[in-house]
Structure formats: structure tokens, C-alpha cells
Amino acid sequence: MSRRLLTSLASSSFGASYSSLTKPIAQATRGICDSACVRSHENPLGIPRRNPNPAPTIPRRGAPPQKSRIRGVKQIVVVASGKGGVGKSTVAANLALSLLQTSTLSRPARIGLLDLDIFGPSVPKLMGLENAGDPELSDENKLIPLQNHGVKTMSIGYLLRESCSHFPCLSTYTPNPENDTPVVWRGMMVMKAVQQLLFDVDWTTKTGTTSGSSGTESGSSDLDVLVIDMPPGTGDVQLSLGQLVAVDGAVIVSTPQDVALIDARKGVAMFNKVSIPMIGLLLNMSHFTCDSCTKPHELFGSSAKFEKAAMDLNLEVLGKIPLVPTISDGGDAGRPVMVQSSGEGEEVRQSMRSVGETVWEWLSGRERADVGTRG
């Protein structure tokens, strides 16, 4: 772990006036972790509390909380699915790269990828950042994203690795090189961790120094788009995001099976309830093309069922992603298909570029909600 982050964590003070819910949930058992374990129900990531802009909380009673923008982020797109195992995280990673590649801005686009899957984070593996080191802290005690393939990323997975003492008291099990340390938390801890990942990350890009009447100042630029990889289902994480953050649009990923489409419909209904606009549906694993007969085979059911579901929901079909080995192989190697050049993945890249262009078009036609900014 970086010396700066460890020192900051070890020297943090939270006062003695917290309620019983804010007491540390566990104590570290070895070495320097004994003094560094400062996590609590109110601060599950253990980030020092000198931030003048605390994350908003969801009130237990009364009116719903006011949605706000994430500081340092212009627009937000969430990638979700009702059913697990449909390739949502892989799509999210490749969508972020597609947005980077298909931008029509006059300068290189600034894209971020946030992993909100607390129990099953995939972004570190997919983006080739498993061994990239620990996130540093900014001067405002915010987590600094790790970057690869031109995309800034943040995930709780960066804080669970063997080398990271940021989670010294996560469980009674010793972390190991297989990176299989579990997050064993109840709902309150999960929701607080989500709030910290949303509002305690510094997404801005430093742009050097500028001279003015007030002297020399350091400049920074916001992300153009933050892609958020959601966990499957319609639970606490989705509800927290929908209540706290002004999201610009959502993409629902599904496969053609009835069981996946049923849950995809539930995901759309949930986003409608929390007033998150729908960009469209994306069909993943739509077909497999045999090398011998060159005929596409719909292994998981007819894509016509997916198209009918989209029609019933009055949503656009953003694309159809085929089942290609290079997608999973690239994800395992930390090289998403969008940064590969293999001929096998060209059909996928073309489909994802089209999706990226559609999302850019959607975002360019939206007016930013008139809400405050937190973080």
C-alpha cells in the first residue's frame, strides 16, 4: 500500500461522539493494521474525513433526497442487467472504450468506468489493473482512479488485494494471491460503500498550471462520461444510485432467454420508478458463427424474442453482440475486445462502435438536469 495513503489512514481521527452504528465493526489483528483500521458503518472504505463536501445520505423518513451530480463528471451512463451472468461488466468495459474511440469532440474524450458491484467486482480484471497498485488519496482525501487503455477506473476490487491494507479487517480470512477475499457486509455497509465510491473519488484530470491576476493556479478538467457498471438485480445499490445521483441514461444488457428477459423488464421498470432515462437494450451473446459452415447459430434462443421485448417496452435495440471467444479471452487477459486487433473480434468491435455512437448521440441531445453537485 502507498505510504501516503497508509499514513493518512493511520492518523485519521473521527471523534468520540458517534452513535453505536459508527463504531469500527472489527479490529485488525496484525502489524500496522492495528492502528489503520478506521472503517465503520458510516465510513466502510476507511477514507479520512477531512472532505468538506460529505456524500449525501438517504433519510430514513420524509421526502426523498435531492439528486445531485458527481463532482468532476459531466454525464453518467449506467450499464445494468436484471439477471447475472449476461456479460454486463464486459459490455460496460467495452462501452467505455467505445465511447473513447467514437467521440466526435474536438479533443480526446475523457471517459471513466466505475464498478459498483460490491460483492463481485470485475473491472480490475477486465481492465488489466489487478496488479496496478493501490489507489492514492488526493489532497482532499479522495480516491484517485487507476487508469488503463485510456480510461479512468475505480472499483472496490482495488481495495481487496493481498497488498492492500485499506481493508485490513474485512474478514477473518487472510487475503491470498487468488484475490478471492469476500465482502461480507450487510445492507447498511453496502449502501455506505456505494455512496463513498460515488462521491469520494476524484475524477478530474489535471491540466497543468495557468497564470492569472490571482497568481499561478492548477487547472483540472471533468470527465465527459462516467460509465457505471451496476450489480445484477434491483436491490440496494440500484436504489441508492437512483435516489442520490442524477443519471443521464441507462443501458440494459440481456441475453435472449426468457429468464433473462423477465429480469431485464424488471430492471427497466425499476429505472422508470427512480426516473432514470432509458437509452435502450443491448442483446449480448446473440449468436455464434460456426467456422465450418459460417452460419450463425442462436445458442440461447431467438433474437426475435428480445426484439419483441424491446418493442413492448418502447425501447431501442442498441446492438447485438455475438458470442466470440476473443471477448472472454481478452477479458481474462485484461485486454477488452475494443483494444484488440484480431479479426475474430471485428464483428464485436463494429457492434460496440455503433453502440458508442448511439450513446454519444443520446447524450448530446440531453439537457443537464438543474441539480447541485456533490463530492
List PLM regions with ranges.
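N-terminal chloroplast transit peptides
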Residues: 1-21
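Phosphate-binding P-loop
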Residues: 68-74
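Residue-level signature of catalytic and energy-coupling elements of molecular machines
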Residues: 73, 84, 114-115, 123, ...
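Conserved nucleotide-binding/hydrolysis micro-motifs of P-loop NTPases
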Residues: 118-120, 159-161, 175-177, 232-234, ...
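Inter-motif core of Ras-like GTPase G domains
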Residues: 199-205, 221, 225, 237-259
